[in-house]
């Protein structure tokens, strides 16, 4: 029995180290530290975030520490200069652990607006007691608008919104699928009017509370991948880093 447990441990360790870099992970904030007003993007793209307002690293996160957002605070991603090749187009996933202070308002997990004024994405904790997952294509046409699941205040919940233009959309809360939507269209192609974590571009829907382990992908993850990332993080502790200094892939790659 001891030998078999040791062998299993070695197998899991080898899998962790051997995991290959996932080029579709474009943003990963593990919320373990703030570096002089900068939130480092652990996806290795070099596209870091800038703190605006009062955002603090606190204990009590789901996977280590977490980030607490005061009302009106946000992380600016400099959407106008986000590279086209890194902007999700044919697929997208947004995953995060969230713990909001109140359901007295809607809470924007992430928001971006295209240069043609399209409000292209809304992953939200809603004041009505549910969640929202929406994407739009060029010209402001809605691809899908999922409103489902049960939101509560002062409790950790995992949000997992995924989309693939070929197969459609799904919303997972705490790893369980609670809604789906159609595919068929590419996502609006740029973030020219801005991109933020925790506050809409027009200073609406402030996220107030704690957030942990936010990741954004330029493909639609599977339900199995969502569950793996929910439990282990987008980049598990101890995962390999390539020679170029970029982050190694998520555990999700092991599930393909």
Language-model regions: role of each:
Residues 173-195:
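Short, solvent-exposed beta-strand-to-loop segments that form ligand-recognition rims
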């Amino acid at each position: 029995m001891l030998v078999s447990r040791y062998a299993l441990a070695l197998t899991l360790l080898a899998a962790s180290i051997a995991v290959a870099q996932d080029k579709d992970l474009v943003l990963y904030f593990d919320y373990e530290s703030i570096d002089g007003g900068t939130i480092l993007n652990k996806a290795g793209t070099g596209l870091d975030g800038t703190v605006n307002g009062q955002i603090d690293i606190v204990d009590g996160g789901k996977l280590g520490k977490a980030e607490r957002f005061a009302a009106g605070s946000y992380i600016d991603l400099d959407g106008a200069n986000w590279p086209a090749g890194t902007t999700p187009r044919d697929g997208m996933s947004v995953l995060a652990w969230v713990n909001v202070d109140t359901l007295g308002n809607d809470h924007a997990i992430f928001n971006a607006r295209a240069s043609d004024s399209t409000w292209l994405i809304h992953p939200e904790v809603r004041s009505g007691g549910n969640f929202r997952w929406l994407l739009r294509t060029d010209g402001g046409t809605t691809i899908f608008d999922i409103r489902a699941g049960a939101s509560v205040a002062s409790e950790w919940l995992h949000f997992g919104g995924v989309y693939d233009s070929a197969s459609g959309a799904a919303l997972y809360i705490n790893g369980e699928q609670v809604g789906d939507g159609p595919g068929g269209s590419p996502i609006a192609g740029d973030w020219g009017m801005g991109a933020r974590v925790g506050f809409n571009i027009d200073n609406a829907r402030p996220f107030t509370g704690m957030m942990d382990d936010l990741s954004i992908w330029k493909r639609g993850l599977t339900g199995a991948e969502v569950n793996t990332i929910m439990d282990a993080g987008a980049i598990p502790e101890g995962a390999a880093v390539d020679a170029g200094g970029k982050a190694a892939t998520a555990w999700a790659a092991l599930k393909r």
